[in-house]
Amino acid sequence: MFKKKEISPYSVEDKVTFRNVDKTITLYVRGDAASYVVGLKKAQDKLSEITGESNEQERVECARFFARTLFGDDQGDQLMDFYNEPLAVITVCGMYFKDRLSKKITKAQKR
């Protein structure tokens, strides 16, 4: 009668809360480890193009791409609106990836 939701053994799921002064936002990560690897490689390439001479629009586009890669389009946009500063978004996304998500992706790939 009811179909069980099939969960890929390579899926990555997480919940993360970000704080900014007196505000908080909770975002959810759900996706396939392999697709994260591909998306994060593209994000890394975009991040490497940012220099001190990059204009604000380039920084915003890069930060938005990184956030969308990690959290999906809607939640990535919410994170951009939450911080309203591209370098802050790049920083928190980088810290989250380094501290938690990379370990979850590696674990999912070993299954």
Tell where the protein language model's regions lie, with residue ranges:
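Short, surface-exposed, charged amphipathic helix/loop patches that serve as local interaction elements
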Residues: 33-111
